[in-house]
Amino acid sequence: MIVNISAKMILSICFTFLSFFKATHAMDLDTTSKTSICDATALIQGGMLDYYEGTRYGGTVGMFQSPYYWWHAGEAFGGMLENWFLCENDTYQELLYDALLAQTGSNYDYIPSNQTMVEGNDDQGIWGITVMGAVERNFTDPGDGKPGWLAMVQAVFNTMYSRWDSEHCGGGLRWQIFTWNSGYNYKNTVSNACLFQIAARLGRYTGNTTYLEVAEQVFDWLVDVGYVVLNDTANVFDGAEIDTNCTDITKIEWTYNHGIVLGGLAYMYNATNGTGEWETSLTKILNGAKSYFFKDSIMYESACQDYGTCNTDQRTFKSIFSRMLGLTSVMAPFTRDTIDDLIKTSAEAAAKSCNGGTDGHTCGLNWQKQTNDGYYGLGEQMSALEVIQNLLIHDRPAPYKEDNGGTSKGDANAGMNSSTTNVLQNNLNIKKGDRAGAAIITAVILSVLTGGAVWMLF
């Protein structure tokens, strides 16, 4: 039988084959080469910015397109800022600077007017962690009379800690800041973990031990309430409603909760010169993370990934988890061998997932598949970026401190107006089980903030 194949059909077949060849060979990663790593992450960042509004006509600087929320932007910029430092690549330096500054809010506390009605404690906390990265990496401080990045993180800390609620569940932050938002009666781990980590990092950076005391208070509460269970492979659960005194805990585990707690513990270990208490807790949390979130040493979101149920939020979680693993390996060097192996294996698999899309370097969700699994989006790009760039975490200086290379300008009173009490003006001596002093301060501050919130309703 003679088959007639037209020239047009032959060309079509050739183009299809070439496209397939390009896509399946798009990202060859050499995990020992900075050039290879940074070339790969440059492609991935380009894919992230396909979703960015800030460079479009009429778009909002510092925001990504729907369905991505404000906190996703904070998480994404945290990864891009690390790439700026680790790869020494200033391609997006101006974009990052403009984005971080555009979303500060008029009080420079990361409560911008465009988020006033919907922002939660976790949202503000994620941005606070990102800006703390700017502090520790000596990202160019704002000029023109604006506060430094350090002052902005201190404002985030002061405003978050002012919401500490001792009346329900013995302490802790609620998920939401404002009463009208769904979830106001839920106290979640991520909000409190963000406060814990920010306090730990501020304590290490500034040398002010009051921050460390607050960090210890927050971590003790997470353990006391049962959100963090310090068995040999520790659990970090999601949260609970105050209606049950936080006893009916949502026992779902996510990479970002583990990661943010892990990072906070690593900073506490470092800031206290390797105190055994923090080493023990850190070891248990790391054991839990390794047990729950790695399959064949490849990172995965165990609560949803195998079931195909990961939502937009959950598809971003591995990004901040990867960042925290990298920072932990620096802040607590005894964890380095374990973490480096996990990052290397996961980075290799993540790179292989970045062979999708028409560009040939769109990343996927399930790295175990060793190729793109059909998922794509900002979260997939963010996660691949962070795990791959953390191959370089030991090739650059450790996060700076105020007395060791840090340059950002601070203000311990940032975020607090004249009618509120700054927690750092009181040399708190917070012990486990002794919350009275903090409760009094919190009550004073909450009365002012509540008055402001009531005014906003009219």
Curated annotation (Swiss-Prot):
Membrane topology: Lipid-anchor; GPI-anchor
Source organism per UniProt: Saccharomyces cerevisiae (strain ATCC 204508 / S288c)
Function noted in UniProt: Required for normal synthesis of the cell wall.
Family listed: Belongs to the glycosyl hydrolase 76 family.
GO terms for MF: mannan endo-1,6-alpha-mannosidase activity
Record flagged with keyword Cell inner membrane: no
Residue numbers covered by the propeptide annotation in the UniProt entry: 438-458
Enzyme class: hydrolase
Other facts: Present with 2950 molecules/cell in log phase SD medium.
Protein name: Mannan endo-1,6-alpha-mannosidase DFG5
